[in-house]
Amino acid sequence: WIDRVLAERAYEVIFVDDGSKDNSWEIIEQLHAADPERVVGIRFSRNYGKSAGLQKGFEAARGRIVVTLDADLQDSPEEILDMERLILEEGYDLVSGWKKKRHDPLSKTIPTRLYNAATRWVSGIALHDFNCGLKAYRLEVVKAIEVQGEMHRYIPILAKDAGFNRIGEQVVQHQSRKYGT
């Protein structure tokens, strides 16, 4: 899917296996063996959490634009090109996905809306969906921030604190979760 979307571009895919118990690592190894120039695998011995996975991916990233995408297939790689355009043509440092129409239960949607409103108010960053895993960054942004603990939820704030003030958002499609929890 990513290969189809980015077919005519130079890109790399960095997979971070955060201590999965299924056959994720074997699949990553197969993908790397088939395309060692484009596919990088990082494996954790146990589950360290999303922030640690993002940090290791950011450390390994080499491309001019870095895109984060969760493996649960709720977000579509089809969105990458529009986000890339906002960075390259509109001058954004970071573009966050906004799941405007969510396919989650109310038990998740209501707390998410409250969290986003509070975070928007406290940070002064006009985003609707701080926690969307689909984001695009200039390489300089991911190299300037350090994501620890549960700080993946606050990456736009970390970026702003590091001097990257051009933060925008892109409405993205949201699918029901296919994998993971």
Q: Residue spans of the language-model regions?
A:
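Short, conserved SAM-binding/catalytic segment
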Residues: 31-35
